Amino acid sequence: LGYILLGRVIEKVSGLPYEDYISTHIISRLGLGPDQLGFEIYNSRRNATGYHKHKSFSNLILGLFLDKSRFMGEPEEGWKPFKDYYINGAPYGGLIGTADAYVKYIQDLLKPDSSLIDPSYKNQMFEDNHTNNGKATGMCLSWYTGMLKGHRYCHHAGGGGGYYCEIRIYPERGIGSVIMFNRTGMT
């Protein structure tokens, strides 16, 4: 719900549809084409088929949320493939991209002179949030935080039925990564 509302705020303030605002102020600034990062599937033959584990509790309850006969194919070696579909919910998960496009996004965020965000706002973006009593929430602005071998990182995951993507940034180290799966979640 939060990202849907944020998308509406962006539309109200900018006067542009959410997809147009993101395309103009983020995607085009990175020099990416709509086939690299955007809100449409340009060539479904180049997209990976998404899968969900066939014999799993989550697959059992998945039928409560969608018509599996309409959106999923027959099981393949323990996995159920999703048929081509697009989630109509751009602010909360409608961006489709390649690994190279997300790497370009991460690289720009790590630059001192990012084309996407002013340095003072970037510092706020990766700053830990705290509750009113000072307890860390484990989140920044739209990023979750964690530690790996003593190094702090910020990450954001996305996906949907049959897909999972996570970008991770280590702000203090100046490095980042992207990982993509054509299966639901990491488990």
Task: Walk through the language-model features, giving the residues of each.
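Short, well-ordered beta-strand elements
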Residues: 155-157, 165-183
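Catalytic cores of secreted or luminal carbohydrate-active enzymes
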Residues: 186-187
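Short, surface-exposed loop or secondary-structure junction motifs
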Residues: 1-161
